[in-house]
Amino acid sequence: MSLVSGLTEVTDADFETEVRGSELPVLVQFTADWCGPCRQLAPVLKDIAFEEGDRLKVVQIDVDRNPGTTVAYGVLSTPTLMVFRDGEPVRSMVGARPKRRLMEELADVL
């Protein structure tokens, strides 16, 4: 079940295929059920996924259930947002932010 309705949840098992193997840039939210700022960010990510779906894939991964990927990318805080392009991380951002600011930060990777 998705942590945020409307967003795809990835796991340690399918991260390689879903994120690193994607033809589109991928915005990954490293999140947790107990994370308040993650919940604040949820409507922003849903909007971006809907509006930018042809240019950007938006997914989430639960840090508690997927420690392998979390550790592999050095995620220490939630929410951490990481952008992958051509299978490699190209941007990392920590903390919730309004949609306008997030879109400005994503402009050069879209």
Name every feature range the model reports, one short phrase each.
Residues 1-57, 65-68, 72-80, 85-110:
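Proteins that catalyze or organize thiol-disulfide redox chemistry
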Residues 60:
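Conserved residues in the N-terminal Rossmann fold of short-chain dehydrogenase/reductase
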